[in-house]
Amino acid sequence: MALAAPESSKNLGLSSLPTIAAIATPLGRGGVGVIRLSGTHAYSIACTLTGKSAFKPRMASFCRFYQADGTVIDEGLVLYFKGPHSFTGEDVIELQGHGGMILQNQLLARVFELGAKQASAGEFSYRAFDNDKLDLVQAEAIADAIDATSAAAASSAIRSLSGEFSQKINQLLEQLIHLRLHVEAAIDFPDEEDVDFLSDGVIQGKLEQTQEKIQQVLATAKQGQLLRDGIHVVLAGRPNAGKSSLLNRLAGQERAIVTDVAGTTRDTLQETVVLNGLTLHLTDTAGLRETEDTVERIGIERARTAIAQADMLLMVYDVTRDLEEESTPLQLAEQLFGELPEAKRLLIIANKSDLLNNNSSKEITSISQQEIHNRGYEQVNVSCETGAGIDDLVETLCAKVGFHPPENSLIARTRHLDALRRTAEYLAEAHEQLTVFKAGELVAESLRQAQHSLGEITGEFSADDLLGKIFGSFCIGK
């Protein structure tokens, strides 16, 4: 359930917002189940539920949880976090009972009877954001830590949650604010010699320093986005080229059926793996060819859809048979895909390279590789049978998408990259207005737009529909 334009405690006052509750642990059978409450009435609900008159903040209390008629629902621990010293900034109660959906649902129903409302997806985190306990980057990092598919992604998300990414953005915002102050002062007081920024070079130097730092943060964010999202890789080629065998090699297990019969793979098959720290969302596809088989034809249509949506294409071909006389891998790619994909999006995989056992075949392959290199493409020779070349393939793939995660990488999202790019564009405009046109008012406006774009990252400038979309993607109970 999406969180649509949540009401702000800053507008309504904390006491006007309903007390919310939700199961905070995963659904299903478990040793412990946690129900979280947040709001003005969380404390009184806990007292009524347990028959206790008081709870000490940050102290665990063993209690029984009662129905209205005195029947015991469950027993467990109550933790009380008094606002504003809590995750949400409000009074927060955690009820830790036994796991299992029957007991959890009975306990949650009783909490609702006592006046709490069902929390929307991400509503606890939204209240933390709304009460300045988290900025938007930190709030997103909670979801990213939960959804991390690799150890590197998880540790990067925790660094973002601790505020490292936000600190970089806030430092840049502070620089932009100082730049704007100097520029606008020069506009307002044009007769003052000490603010003649159009000719003294001071503002230009500060602007160029800010541009350089934006590019540094953007480079870090690109790595963070790759860590978070990974890349979607489609394996494509003719039937029996070795696509399914390559998927199995990369996955480290027999995920796809492999036979000598052409057309064995008739549908797309997805597998997610983490190699060299990069998450690869792999899709094996039906071999591309003309066919009268209805089922295979549907599989080929799905393959072409996957190809169109892929971040990276691995065109797998059998070096012993797939290249017709005088044809090259690039010509084969053009035949298979209808047009030659961009070099940054295509990696050519020469399978069964271990079977090149005569000089003429090796010479043809060498000539093909030279043509591939001259046109800016890359080919990796592999053997899916022996595993030779697979490590080279992974390293080449990581390099091709620009994945070189630094030790202290920070998780980032597509919207962060978009905001940073727009900020860089506005700064470039400001630089041009300053150095070419000497137009102070236009410099100030470009800097204002740059500040606004950068502020979107931490939530300083964010529309309600954006906030609803972000927090609506969270788990219930977060």
From Swiss-Prot:
Function: Exhibits a very high intrinsic GTPase hydrolysis rate. Involved in the addition of a carboxymethylaminomethyl (cmnm) group at the wobble position (U34) of certain tRNAs, forming tRNA-cmnm(5)s(2)U34.
Protein name: tRNA modification GTPase MnmE
InterPro entries found in the cross-reference section: G_TrmE (IPR031168), GTP-bd (IPR006073), GTP-bd_TrmE_N (IPR018948), GTPase_MnmE (IPR004520), MnmE_dom2 (IPR027368), MnmE_helical (IPR025867), P-loop_NTPase (IPR027417), Small_GTP-bd (IPR005225)
Keywords of the record: Cytoplasm, GTP-binding, Hydrolase, Magnesium, Metal-binding, Nucleotide-binding, Potassium, tRNA processing
Location of the TrmE-type G domain: 230-402
Subunit organization: Homodimer. Heterotetramer of two MnmE and two MnmG subunits.
Cofactor(s) of this protein: K(+)
Family affiliation: Belongs to the TRAFAC class TrmE-Era-EngA-EngB-Septin-like GTPase superfamily. TrmE GTPase family.
Annotated positions binding GTP: 240-245, 259-265, 284-287
Binding site for Mg(2+): S244, T265
Chain's gene name: mnmE
The organism of origin for this protein: Psychrobacter cryohalolentis (strain ATCC BAA-1226 / DSM 17306 / VKM B-2378 / K5)
Chain positions recorded as (6S)-5-formyl-5,6,7,8-tetrahydrofolate binding sites: R36, E94, K133, K478
Any one GO cellular component localisation term in the record: cytosol
EC number from the UniProt entry: 3.6.-.-
Sections of the chain in a coiled coil: none
Pfam family, one: MnmE_helical
